[in-house]
Curated annotation (Swiss-Prot):
Organism: Brassica napus (Rape)
Region forming the signal peptide: 1-25
Keyword Ligase: no
PROSITE patterns in the cross-refs: PLANT_LTP
Protein name (record): Non-specific lipid-transfer protein 2
Family statement drawn from the similarity comment of this UniProt entry: Belongs to the plant LTP family.
Transmembrane segments: none
Keywords: Disulfide bond, Lipid-binding, Signal, Transport
Amino acid sequence: MAGLMKLACLVLACMIVAGPITSNAALSCGTVSGYVAPCIGYLTQNGPLPRGCCTGVTNLNNMARTTPDRQQACRCLVGAANSFPTLNAARAAGLPKACGVNIPYKISKSTNCNSVR
């Protein structure tokens, strides 16, 4: 039950963060949150890396093909990262590599998403 509450908070935080952002991106923070939701235990509780997490990271990377989409995904991930005080920063930064995915930015609480291309 606590995990569902955290997921609900994550989705809400992403929507609040992305609400005022105007862009041509097709990705919403709700979509991004759905892709990375299976990663929450890995990123906050030092749990094992679930297959569903890597599937979500791969699918998100495949959807974020344009610069606006990559910037929007980045903003959503930064917003989500900031909503979890127990986020393991090293695991978040290393998540793409752990899943065999190459993304053009570091997942962290302080990533400048405007510089993402």
